[in-house]
């Protein structure tokens, strides 16, 4: 075997060892979720044959030809008994694309499919696409709604940073062949749009996040709700805010729906992200809330504070101090797999159950919106516990 082939064999063996590494739970926790020791996907998990030209004649030094920078913000779905993430893969060139990775158990051994997703273009091509939410809708299609980013051509000459965000829509029956639908038409920019899994009053329902600019929400008040007559020509008319932003909370700057909600006997379980500003920049955390089965716009539970925040190495990455989730899977036995990205760099999994998540939502105190209210809530728990401890 030649030296070149030896190097290729070593690359492939190292990659296979990474993919086969067994993940293990981190036991210490808060009783709500279980974290796992290793990320489930990193840039190093992408196939060797995506990154290297394995032909000695055209790549005699075995150099990496196409660099991969990050794997993040993945949608998720259970498909043919496998746990699938539709991953945002970011190349070294900063362009993102979508690729499917599958696992037999949802915890480890995630492998990318051979090819990334070939996503048809809209009439107006996007420069970048990312953060797809997957919804298996009752109409029989699997929908993917994602952010389609384009340069803001109304920006001053020489401004190469200003951009616009719209919600791109695509659908599939097999996660391989995709039909591109027209982008969502709205009065404002949109970059966190999620399709509700069921019809509501015979219409498609969307969770939205209206915002004035590409980054800043401005007058956008929180997570919105809109009904759509025709998903193939989707347009938001009336839009109402169902989960508001509040001053001095974990969602004072902006918030956005994560994956589509999970239906439970007690209500719809929602996972969302909240953003606040601090000396280190924008801090992204995850939080939960519940809405009514009879009226998905009616809030029935809103626990105070964050559900998950970055810890340990999760704090470090391309965009530090960030957790983001747009994918989870609920198994028939009630186990829930929460897929989340840390610091725009890598993908992790945490597990819980429907029962625990509902208990967390219904029995965690709501935000009192002041220090004195927080103290009173804390005193109430202390008093009850002290009586039990006597």
UniProtKB/Swiss-Prot annotation:
Keywords: Carbohydrate metabolism, Cell wall biogenesis/degradation, Glycosyltransferase, Transferase. It comes from the Bacteria. Optimum pH is 7. Its EC number is 2.4.1.281. CDD domains: GH130. It is an enzyme of class 2 (transferase). SUPFAM superfamilies: Arabinanase/levansucrase/invertase. Optimum temperature is 50 degrees Celsius. Disulfide bonds: none annotated. GO terms for molecular function: hexosyltransferase activity. It catalyses: 4-O-beta-D-mannopyranosyl-D-glucopyranose + phosphate = alpha-D-mannose 1-phosphate + D-glucose. GO terms for biological process: carbohydrate metabolic process; cell wall organization. Coiled coil: none annotated. Belongs to the glycosyl hydrolase 130 family. Converts 4-O-beta-D-mannopyranosyl-D-glucopyranose (Man-Glc) to mannose 1-phosphate (Man1P) and glucose. Involved in a mannan catabolic pathway which feeds into glycolysis. This is 4-O-beta-D-mannosyl-D-glucose phosphorylase. It comes from Bacteroides fragilis (strain ATCC 25285 / DSM 2151 / CCUG 4856 / JCM 11019 / LMG 10263 / NCTC 9343 / Onslow / VPI 2553 / EN-2).
């Amino acid at each position: 075997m030649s030296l070149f082939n030896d190097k290729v064999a070593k690359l492939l063996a190292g990659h296979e060892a990474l993919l086969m590494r067994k993940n293990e739970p981190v036991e210490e926790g808060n009783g709500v979720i279980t974290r796992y020791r290793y990320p489930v996907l990193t840039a190093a998990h992408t196939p060797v044959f995506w990154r290297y030209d394995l032909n000695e004649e055209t790549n005699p030094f075995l150099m990496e030809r196409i660099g991969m920078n990050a794997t993040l913000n993945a949608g998720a779905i259970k498909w043919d008994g496998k746990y699938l993430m539709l991953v945002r893969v970011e190349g070294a060139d900063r362009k993102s694309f979508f690729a499917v990775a599958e696992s037999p158990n949802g915890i480890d051994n995630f492998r990318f499919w051979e090819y990334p997703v070939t996503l048809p273009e809209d009439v107006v091509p996007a420069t970048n696409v990312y953060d797809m939410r997957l919804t298996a809708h009752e109409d029989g299609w699997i929908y993917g709604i994602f952010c389609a980013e384009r340069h803001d051509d109304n920006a001053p000459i020489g401004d190469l940073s200003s951009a616009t965000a719209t919600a791109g829509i695509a659908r599939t029956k097999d996660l391989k062949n995709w039909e591109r639908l027209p982008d969502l038409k709205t009065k404002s920019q949109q970059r966190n749009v999620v399709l509700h899994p069921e019809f509501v009053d015979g219409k498609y329902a969307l969770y939205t996040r209206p915002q004035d600019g590409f980054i800043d929400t401005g007058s956008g008040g929180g997570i919105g709700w809109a009904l759509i007559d025709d998903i193939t020509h989707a347009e938001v008319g009336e839009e109402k805010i169902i989960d508001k932003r509040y001053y001095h909370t974990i969602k004072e700057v902006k918030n956005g729906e994560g994956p589509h909600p999970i239906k439970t006997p007690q209500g719809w379980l929602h996972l969302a992200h909240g953003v606040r500003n601090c000396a280190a920049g924008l801090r992204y955390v995850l939080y939960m809330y519940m809405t009514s089965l009879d009226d998905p716009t009616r809030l029935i539970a809103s626990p105070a504070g964050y559900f998950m925040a970055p810890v340990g190495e999760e704090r470090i990455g391309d965009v530090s101090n960030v957790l983001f989730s747009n994918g989870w899977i609920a198994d028939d036995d009630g186990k829930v797999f929460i897929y989340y990205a840390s610091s725009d760099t890598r993908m992790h999994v945490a597990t819980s159950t429907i029962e625990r998540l509902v208990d967390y939502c219904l029995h965690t105190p709501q935000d009192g919106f002041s220090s004195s209210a927080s103290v009173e809530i804390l005193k109430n728990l202390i008093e009850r516990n002290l009586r039990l401890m006597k």
